[in-house]
Amino acid sequence: LITGLVTLTAGCKKKDMSLKLNEPRNIRGVVSYKRSFPDLNDKHLAVAQAVGICPPEDRDAAEKMKEQLIHITDNQFYTVDSLTHSIPYLVPRASELLDTIGSNFLDSLTAKGLNPNQIIVTSVLRSQSDVKRLRRRNGNASANSAHCYGATFDVSWKRFKKVEDEDGRPLQDV
């Protein structure tokens, strides 16, 4: 009887629903973004032209190229933002790279003692008409965008999506 009572009360233990805190360790900052992330558009564009598709004039033309592209949607590595000036397609090599970056980001957070978060994809394939519309709003947008080749994607550098705790505990922001 006592053994059964102990077993019964042990099974009724209340779940810990306190805020799951980050336990940061071994985190180093970036000294020079220019050196760490040499974002050279001419080199980027040359690679996109070599491995990408022929730039579609509009979204209808892009739809006709779907057999050459991978449709990207939310998965365990990343989430796709609401896209206003691009459509969620990439060439296979770029899609694989996006998966790798998302996976590496999750692994890096774990290694640094931080709660899991997914990267947020903010831009992918753009048609020529998407670029034209974007340039009206964003003076920094390139007329000859590597996004038009389906070999380029952007991710947010400051917004992330929390991966929900399997026990439902709230997580501290990263």
Regions found by a protein language model. Name each.
Residues 12-111:
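Extracytoplasmic cell-surface/polysaccharide-interacting catalytic and binding patches
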Residues 1-7:
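Bacterial N-terminal signal peptides
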